[in-house]
Amino acid sequence: MATPASTPDTRALVADFVGYKLRQKGYVCGAGPGEGPAADPLHQAMRAAGDEFETRFRRTFSDLAAQLHVTPGSAQQRFTQVSDELFQGGPNWGRLVAFFVFGAALCAESVNKEMEPLVGQVQDWMVAYLETRLADWIHSSGGWAEFTALYGDGALEEARRLREGNWASVRTVLTGAVALGALVTVGAFFASK
């Protein structure tokens, strides 16, 4: 049941983050979500957490979207498989950030492979996943206000220490997600023969 977790506009949060990441990679021009500094403290916190995540896990995560060999026909299935694998051990804020980074990476890979229409679809899938599968956890964990307190500007040192624990298992989950994606690709290849 999705209610309080989506009190801040989930679609605006996703659009801002994806736009921000696409602009970092030089893919999007002109005004739109993700351009310039975020006025909303939640958007600022998600951008900062995403940047930190990418810095910490660059080697593990860098080519995940490319390794999935996404096509317009397989994109939603791959998105769901990786997202489900990511949260298999239960949600936490670190995994939620990884979900945002993965979604943005999938959007960037779509643009890179000239499949721009997938960008809007991936954002829709992200919003739906957040609002149907993660909303209750977000709400029970203090909502987006708690996320902003943990990851936003001026966060207490204690919050940073707690956050370190959330990042610890993300590398293992991402490695598993890459392996799952590779197995699905190999399985699909052999099934088509």
From Swiss-Prot:
GO terms for biological process: extrinsic apoptotic signaling pathway in absence of ligand; negative regulation of apoptotic process; regulation of apoptotic process; Sertoli cell proliferation. A motif (BH4) lies at residues 9-29. GO terms for cellular component: Bcl-2 family protein complex; cytosol; mitochondrial membrane. A motif (BH1) lies at residues 85-104. Interacts with HIF3A isoform 2 (via C-terminus domain). Interacts with BOP. It is a peripheral membrane protein. A motif (BH2) lies at residues 136-151. This is Bcl-2-like protein 2. The modification N-acetylalanine is found at residue 2. Keywords: Acetylation, Apoptosis, Membrane, Mitochondrion. Belongs to the Bcl-2 family. It is found in: Mitochondrion membrane. GO terms for molecular function: disordered domain specific binding; identical protein binding.
